[in-house]
Amino acid sequence: MSILLKGGTVVSAYNRRQLDIRIDGEQIVEMGANLPVENSQIEDVTGCYVLPGFIDAHTHLELNNGKGSLSTADNFTTGSQAAVAKGTTTVIDMATPNKGGSLKDCLATWNQLAEGKSSCDYTYHMSMIEWKPTIAAEIQEMIAAGITSFKMYMAYDNLRTTDAEIFEAMKEIKKVNGMLGVHCENGDLVDELIQSYVSQGKLTPHYHPLSRPAAVEAEAVARYLMIAEMADLSVNIVHLSTKRSLEAVERARQRGQSVYVETCPQYLLLDDHLY
């Protein structure tokens, strides 16, 4: 028996319309005004907006900080429940291997974390926290397993790779038409600024944004995009947070590069005057 949503306002990227929607299994099979109700489970959604399920393309569920002392607040059970409650029907989690571990083992670990526990659809971006021939050889395996996007870091000592390694990874990812997203910060400068404030005993939240000024992100974004231009790869920038970084993206697009960008609500609503 199909499910018939009646009386709702369907919102798309183009317009809003009063339409009925028929769902069979997990597919929308028909949309139109006053669809027949025979052999249907009717759900009256009059007065409601009907939208496609949202996709949260950047989650960290049950992620350990790599030092064994701290994990993110949500796991696949609680995180997916929170997602569904607000209309998100797919999450793309950041699968992150241990140092020295394989991508294949990481994928198996994340499947074990998620299987039978998630209330919504899920998939992963595969993080590559080091670069070596065995990792390069696994990229094709990840594509075959349905993982088409990868992540690397320019910051955090336990996660970051060098510019040369990012360049080599880009060339391998291009071979399989994959996508690379990178956490863009100048890790050396961040570490130096943090150490400078710590040595002065300046440990309050006020100094957190001072240790990560806009320039350290903008510089890394510009550098990343130059590397991507050399590799001729379409790329993504994760959680972009500053105007100067966006200006670097706009310059790259004017040069003809294909660049995708994500941001987060906190970067749109909060700034450092709060600290």
Regions found by a protein language model. Give the residues of each.
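Histidine-rich, glycine-flanked metal-binding segment
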Residues: M1-G53, K67
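Divalent metal-coordination and catalytic microenvironments
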Residues: G8, E26, G47, H58, ...
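Metal-associated gating/positioning segment near the N- to mid-region
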Residues: C48-K117, T134
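Short, ordered loop/turn segments at secondary-structure junctions
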Residues: G66, A95-P97, S127, A155, ...
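Short, surface-exposed connector motifs at secondary-structure boundaries
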Residues: G87-I92, S118-T123, I147-S149, I227-S234
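Alpha-helix-loop-beta-strand connector modules within alpha/beta enzyme cores
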Residues: K104-C120, E168-V182
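Active-site beta->alpha loop and helix N-cap motifs at the rims of alpha/beta catalytic domains
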Residues: M128-P133
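Histidine/acidic residue-rich metal-binding segments in metalloenzymes
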Residues: T134-Y275
